[in-house]
């Protein structure tokens, strides 16, 4: 059975390559703005990942396992997705500075052969160092934060701001590896 990653994220590709030998990437065209956050962060990221997987699965012509994910940073009851512009990134990084936040990733696996759908969610706590405005501006000028939830990438320059984490490192990158590995064990595909 084919494995399809419903994401254009190079970080998700890199993570999935750790456990799945062969897969294809098919970008989801689902409009994430059609789902509003209504207070339940786990439901929100699972709904987003499920809708991404459904959109891709409808375009496939052969039995496949479609994997999708959605990752957000959550702090003080607010969802921090990808920054809209540099000012938005500055605001996000300023609010994360010196504080602990949570990163939630929803994952979804759809078996297109029998239409089974599995969703799950992972949460990682991340503690940031105190950052001054110059550090934040320098980081924004690198361009790195502009395509990442919460305006930072733990696997890149943004990792310098992280004092510690509690939970899955790969979840912060965008794909909770252990949860995904456990979910994939139920399918007839080669993993590891």
Swiss-Prot record:
Name of protein: dTTP/UTP pyrophosphatase
InterPro entries: ITPase-like_fam, Maf-like
Enzyme Commission code: 3.6.1.9
Catalytic activities: dTTP + H2O = dTMP + diphosphate + H(+); UTP + H2O = UMP + diphosphate + H(+)
Gene Ontology biological-process annotations: nucleotide metabolic process
UniProt entry keywords in alphabetical sequence: Cytoplasm, Hydrolase, Nucleotide metabolism
Important for substrate specificity (site feature) positions: 11, 71, 155
Natural source organism: Clostridium perfringens (strain 13 / Type A)
Subcellular localization(s) per the UniProt record: Cytoplasm
One GO CC term, this protein: cytoplasm
Function: Nucleoside triphosphate pyrophosphatase that hydrolyzes dTTP and UTP. May have a dual role in cell division arrest and in preventing the incorporation of modified nucleotides into cellular nucleic acids.
Family: Belongs to the Maf family. YhdE subfamily.
Sample GO molecular function, one term: UTP diphosphatase activity
Pfam families per UniProt: Maf
Gene (name only): maf
The protein's required cofactors: a divalent metal cation
Location of the active site: 70
């Amino acid at each position: 059975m084919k494995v399809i990653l419903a994401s254009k994220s190079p970080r998700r590709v890199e993570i999935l390559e750790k456990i799945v030998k062969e897969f294809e990437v098919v970008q989801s065209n689902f409009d994430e703005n059609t789902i509003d956050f209504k207070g339940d962060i786990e439901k929100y990221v699972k709904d987003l990942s499920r809708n991404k997987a459904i959109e891709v699965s409808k375009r496939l012509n052969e039995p496949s396992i479609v994997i999708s994910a959605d990752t957000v940073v959550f702090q003080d009851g607010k969802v921090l997705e990808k920054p809209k512009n540099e000012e938005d990134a500055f605001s996000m990084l300023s609010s994360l500075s010196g504080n602990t936040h949570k990163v939630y990733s929803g994952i979804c696996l759809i078996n297109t052969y029998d239409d089974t759908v599995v969703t799950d969610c992972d949460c990682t706590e991340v503690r940031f160092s105190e950052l001054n405005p110059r550090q934040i501006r320098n980081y924004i000028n690198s361009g790195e934060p502009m395509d990442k939830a919460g305006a930072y990438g733990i696997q890149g320059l943004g990792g310098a701001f992280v004092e510690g984490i509690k939970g899955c490192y790969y979840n912060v990158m965008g794909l909770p590896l252990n949860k995904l590995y456990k979910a994939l064990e139920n399918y007839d595909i080669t993993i590891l």
